[in-house]
Amino acid sequence: MRLKDKVAIVTGAGKGIGRAAALAAAAEGATVVTVARTQSDLDETVRLIRENGGTASSLSRDLTCGEQAASMVDSVLQMYGRIDILINNAGGYPKEIYEGREHQAIRLWEWSEEQWDQIIRTNLRIPFLCMKHVIPVMIRQGSGKIVSVSSRMGRIASQMGAYSVAKGGIVTMTKTAAIQTQEYGIQVNAVAPGMVDTPGQRVYNHSVGQDDAVMGSADDVA
């Protein structure tokens, strides 16, 4: 087991890629702390991990709030005394933003300030806050690994507006963090998957008339 005795935080672990990543980390021997807003989703992830012989706990947090991100880190340290791995997966593209568009993209100038801020807060602010509070712990330890989940949409000029901007920001933030933390024995990387078969992706595909799109699985990413 490659992750035996390691403590891993997985954000957005209630479903989709986050759940698959939590299960994969646990299968490799890590003690997994699952984090998301919805406790019932976390309960199911923890149940699946334990059912397969793994070790897991859960923390319900709104990670767009800096105080709650700090509280997450404090709670993990109180429980386990260290943080070896952070999987920065929390994010999303709320369906209320694209519902009723009749397969039409939101052009850049059509985004409301509220919509734009919501997407940036969910997809870029959360990974920033998690790194902000986890990295000092890893520096003290002299080691750690961080993996953030970006998207193919963050690497191209896409029709997804703020979502693409946020996911592209993750790539740049990852490169910055990697350069600034390498002297402390910390490795920072990102993955940028294409379409992944998750509940949210299926809803989005239907809204834009792509029900027959070929998708990868969350396990592929994990």
Please name every model-derived segment:
Residues G92, Q104-F128, S143, V147, ...:
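Catalytic Tyr-X3-Lys loop
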Residues V7, G14-G16:
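Conserved glycine-rich cofactor-binding loop
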Residues M131, A166, T174:
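Active-site helix of classical SDR
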Residues P136, I179-Q180:
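Alpha-helical segment proximal to the catalytic Tyr-Lys
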